[in-house]
Structure formats: C-alpha cells, structure tokens
Amino acid sequence: MAGEQGVDFSGYERIKATRRGRVLTLSLSNPGKLNAVDAAMHRELSRVFLDAADDPASDIVVLTGEGASFSAGGDLNWMKQGFESGTKGPDAAEAKRIVFSLLDLEKPIVAKVAGPAIGLGATLALFCDVIFAAESARFADPHVRAGIVAGDGGAIIWPQLIGYARAKEYLITGDAISGAEAARIGLVNHAVPEDELDASVDAFADRLAGGAQMAIRYSKVSANIGLKQLAHSILDASVGYEMVTFTTDDHREAVRSFLEKRTPKFGRGI
C-alpha cells in the first residue's frame, strides 16, 4: 500500500536499490569492472532476493546492472586470490542460496540487460521471470574457458530455455550470442534497441504493478514448481563439480593466462 515502509537496502555495497512506485529496482554495482561478481557481491546476492521478498513496499522487482553492463560474471582477480590462498572458490552454500532465493521470490522479477551478461551474470538474468535485453547485449556462460564447470545454475536454466542440444553447445564452448539472437532462439523474451530498453521495461513493470497481485504471484509460483524441483535435483551436483574444478591446474592456468593476456595452455585436467 502507498506509504508503506520498505526494507532498507542501504547496507548493501554491491547492489543498489531504487524505487519507482511499487517497482523495486536492484542494480548490480561493481564500478570499473563491468559489475563483475566479487566476494562481496556474491555474498549479497545470496540474501538480496530474500530481502526483496520481505519488502512490503514493492510488488515488482527489476534486476539490472549499473552503467553499460549487466554483469561480466565472476571477477578473475577474486578467483586468483582464491586459489592463491588455498580456498576452493565461491561459497557453495551461497551459490545455491542465490538460485533458490530467486526461484522462491513470489514477486515477478524482470531482468533488464544491457551490455554483457556473462557466466553468473547470465544465470541471474535467465532465472528471472521475464527478460528484456538490448539487441546489442551479449549473453554467454564461459565457465569452461575459466577451467570450471557451469555449476551455478547455467546447466539448469539454459537447457530449459533453448533445449538441450543448443544449450550444451553454448555451455561447452562458452560462445556468446547477441541480445537479438537470444530473443530469436528463445533464451530471452524481448530484444529492443538499447535506447528503448528503459522505457520498455518501465512500461512492462507498470503493467504488472497495475494487475491483480495475488493472481500474478501465484501464477508465477505455480509455473516455477517444476523448475524448482529440477534445480533441487541438479544444483548440489553441479555446484559440487564446480567446486572440484576450482582446485585444478586448468582453472589456475585459465585465470592467469587471461590476466596476463595470453592464450591458455590446458592440460587434460582429469
């Protein structure tokens, strides 16, 4: 209702919250790094959708990135710090909580994607209910190019959206596609010229905000039942495989070669 006190998101460092009526916009924010996911953002992503669910001042959530990027995926410097310090990569419990809290959010969540949505960035966008992308946006899940498994949800959501054959090709090559091509093959709902993206998302969010909220929410919840069951059947294994590959020589070589701007020399990795 109008005037309700919303959840205070000011304590978040890597996610910025803004409000427009009953629409809550969450913007990934890692300035200078194309909103890459570092330890702080990963931790915050594991709880921000729970806070959004509890927010009484919003009915619709928009997920986007600050500036000209949605998210470039995992921060390679964070990965390098991980293997140099002997840790096994991102926290597995956090990784699972990100996916499940997205799926458990009853409010419709709309992705607004400009620029790159890569790796976990793509996963976040694709688990949203409706995805708007700039025609020039880029989607990819190049975990394999970092020597790791696409375990954070990509192996779940890509096949559901575009079928197993296409999804496996993109997951085992890491190849990128444009927003226009993503819409053509059904990976996203809508691709629009970049200068029309904000207005398109605002209009759609306002349309949902003016609808029957209980009916909208429970229709979404019902549609998500099968997807949640699938996620529960896959995510433990896929995250586990990813954690294993964070310890490999191939992963270390992938990260170092990228930071050193050279071609990686992979071993067999098994």
Ranges and model annotations:
Residues 37, 91-94, 151, 193, ...:
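Residue-level signature of the cytosolic catalytic core of signaling kinases
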